[in-house]
Amino acid sequence: MSDYKDTLNLPKTSFSMKGNLANKEPMILNKWEKQGIYKKIREHFAGREKFVLHDGPPYANGSIHVGHAVNKILKDIIIKSKTLSGYDAPFTPTWDCHGLPIELQVEKKHGKAGQSISEDDFRKECRKYAKKQVEIQKKDFKRLGVLGDWEQPYLTINFDYEANMIRTLAKIIENGHLSKGFKPVHWCTDCGSALAEAEVEYADKVSPAIDVKFKIKDKDKLAQAFGLDSLNHDAFAIIWTTTPWTLPANQAIAVNNQLNYSLIKIEDFYIILAENLVEQTLKRYAIENAQIIATTTGNKLTGIMAEHPFYSRHVPILHGDHVTDDSGTGLVHTAPTHGVDDFTLGKEHNLSMEIFVKGNGCYSENTKLFAGEFIFKANDRIIELLGEKKRLMNSDKIKHSYPHCWRHKTPLMFRATPQWFISMEKQGLRDKALQAIKETSWAPSWGQARIEGMVKDRPDWCISRQRTWGVPLPLFIHKETEELHPNTIEILHKVAEKIEKDGIEAWFNADDCEFITETAQYKSVKDTLDVWFDSGSSSMCILDLDKRLSYPADLYLEGSDQHRGWFQTSLLVAMSAKGSQPYKEVFTHGFVVDEHGRKMSKSLGNVTSPQDIYNTLGADILRLWTASTDYKSEMAVSDQILKRTADTYRRLRNTARFLLSNLDGFNPVTDIIEFDKLVKLDQWAIAKTKEFQDKIIEVYDKYQTHTVAQLIHHFCSIEMGSFYLDIIKDRQYTAKTDGHPRKSAQTAIYHIVHALVRWMAPILSFTADEIWDATPKTTDLPIQLCEWYTGLKSFDQDAELDLEYWAKIQEIRSEVNRVLEIKRNEDVIKASLEAEITIYADKYNYNLLEKLGNELRFLLISSKADLKVIEESTSSSIAANIPGLLIEITKIEEPKCERCWHRSSTVGDNPQYKDICSRCVENITTEAGESREFA
């Protein structure tokens, strides 16, 4: 037996089988850094049509989590796909750097501002801390393969950004959207500050639920309201509340004019309840012997006075539209400084707006009985006092959804304070924003209804904060009237100039006289701006001013929680400052959860960190998982899920390696064969690749990365792995090295690789770079500067063997493989090359297969394949799952060729080559080698 190894075209490539990504990726990153790859992309695509994806700033505090990674990877995939489509698609990373979380971190080390450290030094430490956090996060984002202008990111602490925020505020004021108000706002006692809607999250809380008796002062008026002559016992209006701590601030009881109310006798007193709530309320009280005396409407109760349950003051019964008979008692305790509806009613009736609770959550000195106590701790004392005064009708506990601070996770209170607001009604901002939402494309489509509902119902935006670390609200107000200084716009621009030079310290360290001359009449506002105003201003501070970008952005892409956050604040700032929406399209992705759908939590031990993933499996595995997951809903990740992703990656890598290994020795300048002269199967491979590329570009343009990933995987495993590459192995390995059949396949492979590497590049950025380095090419451009491959061809419309034809051949081949597997299991054959395949076909299928002539066997990877009419079928033939087709498999008895492993009667025909077939002899000894037309 001779050794024919040297006569075979064995695969060879520098592209390794093992990814070893965790070790290779840092080296590839280092190469990109040295190449200045992002700068080269910008130079190469300068002047092209722009595509701007505006980066929503992550908060500069702590290492990135997997949610951050998903967000940046999705953005990177979209940017890279747009670059492949020929757009100038810059990516400028941004960071949110002011606000409470950074303050808290600095407080841990240095203490509170103004106490153990000066406010000026405190701000310097905050700035230093934020910059350090940015560098930590930046390193992680870069490690994920995300390309961007990392050397010039936009930080909200950049002096120019801070200055442009002030200029944006000036435009908002100039357009008439700013208002000052004394209103109830969500207040965090731990923050010591008001919170915006976006900073409020809801969580379950157990609260006291009490029914309180307000004694009616004038029983005669009450009797008259119920159509009675008189009442011989005391009567009480019953209110139900889950916030006993607000009772010291009670100034009224609200009823609804349209509701019916019942007067009920219980032993020796009367109570008033909404008629529809009588039965369930008495059941709650466990009272069975009550007697309904009379019924009246709410409008007849208004104006009647009641006694406060523990203070010596009287409170009126008033009409309130917000009162319903869905729950409670139908009578509502009203504390104007602790609720929006209460406040509205209080303003309407000129009720006292005395403040009983300080910013730290403790009662003020003017609060009788409870001065200095923390409100939530005072609940028990208040309930006890009500019991002592016989004003407690019922006491219970209730678990309900309650607003909490997004940062501290502690319960909030509504507290009326003087604040600055962007008004939703002045200048019609709400209506304009709602119209802008309609003019924006939202995906998923439910995003539109979600943000519409939020904007429709939201209160005015409280933009003032009582914090140290933030951009100032640099206003001057009259000491008596509290009106804005008449030159406010001019002053703001003056402040902005100073901040652009020296940062926000230029305001905080300045004297008022540096900005105004009338210091005797005007005082400066000491508040800072809501941190959501920082990020919400990014369209004005970045897109509208940076000539490298454009306004509005083509795309915003963030987590689904940003409908109430950045999407909304960006819209409100842009509409109030510029009068147009900041984005054309808004896409959202779901939250990352574990395989059981649970939120990531250290306590559950289910946290998957991006650092662990890229240090073990590699960033490309994380990128592939991100792309493969339908990000419109929750995105499940776990070690098991990532293991499956790694298996998929290996299949893709193996396909790429097989393709590259069969391009050894191929010169694209001299060896390319024209499409019309290729073997027909190679024509199909190129046309099929073109079909897939068209689909892939289409779904990339729709940001459907999971569909892209599915198409790439299907292409590699089914169209290539299970069909084309399986068939051409024989031709690639055994045909004449420089012969037409092999060069034809290499031409097809060359085109396939050039298309495939581009499809992969946005997702598998590191691996695509590695593939590109191992690919024969006629360009020196790095893969990041390439556009979609244009060397693919489609079949002519009149082509006989078109894609439809080959799809039918694939179906027939699948059926043959099914029958081969049956015969393997029956031990008739061990491999397909041992099989003699006879296909019995009806006229239609016969005509299809006949076109392939004696090359049918190569398509079926068998040593012998015969085609016969169906009428000649034998009893041993097996019906295919295709009408008009039967398949018979027998074991071939002819000798095995030691070179190609086909069984052939021609083995030994040539005395010089006794152990190989005549086809192999031809490939070894002749100049042209064998010829192929179809396969």
Swiss-Prot record:
Q: Which residues are noted in the entry as L-isoleucyl-5'-AMP-binding?
A: E558
**Annotated motif 'HIGH' region, positions:** 58-68
Does the keyword field hold Electron transport? no
Q: Name one GO cellular component term.
A: cytosol
What residues bind ATP, as annotated? K602
Motif position, 'KMSKS' region = 599-603
One biological process term in Gene Ontology:
isoleucyl-tRNA aminoacylation
Q: Where does Zn(2+) bind?
A: C897, C900, C917, C920
GO molecular function, one example?
A: zinc ion binding
Q: Looking at the record's lineage, which domain of life comes first?
A: Bacteria
State which Enzyme Commission number(s) the record gives: 6.1.1.5
- InterPro entries (UniProt xref): aa-tRNA-synth_I_CS, aa-tRNA-synth_Ia, Anticodon_Ile_BEm, Ile-tRNA-ligase, Ile-tRNA-ligase_type1, Ile-tRNA_ligase, M/V/L/I-tRNA-synth_anticd-bd, Rossmann-like_a/b/a_fold
Q: Which UniProt keywords apply?
A: Aminoacyl-tRNA synthetase, ATP-binding, Cytoplasm, Ligase, Metal-binding, Nucleotide-binding, Protein biosynthesis, Zinc
Q: Does the keyword Transferase apply?
A: no
Record's catalysed reaction(s)? tRNA(Ile) + L-isoleucine + ATP = L-isoleucyl-tRNA(Ile) + AMP + diphosphate
Task: Spell out the family assignment given in the record's similarity comment.
Answer: Belongs to the class-I aminoacyl-tRNA synthetase family. IleS type 1 subfamily.
Q: Which PANTHER family match?
A: ISOLEUCINE--TRNA LIGASE, MITOCHONDRIAL, SOLEUCYL-TRNA SYNTHETASE
Biological role stated in the UniProt entry: Catalyzes the attachment of isoleucine to tRNA(Ile). As IleRS can inadvertently accommodate and process structurally similar amino acids such as valine, to avoid such errors it has two additional distinct tRNA(Ile)-dependent editing activities. One activity is designated as 'pretransfer' editing and involves the hydrolysis of activated Val-AMP. The other activity is designated 'posttransfer' editing and involves deacylation of mischarged Val-tRNA(Ile).
What is the recorded name of this protein?
A: Isoleucine--tRNA ligase
List the taxonomic lineage.
Bacteria, Pseudomonadati, Pseudomonadota, Gammaproteobacteria, Thiotrichales
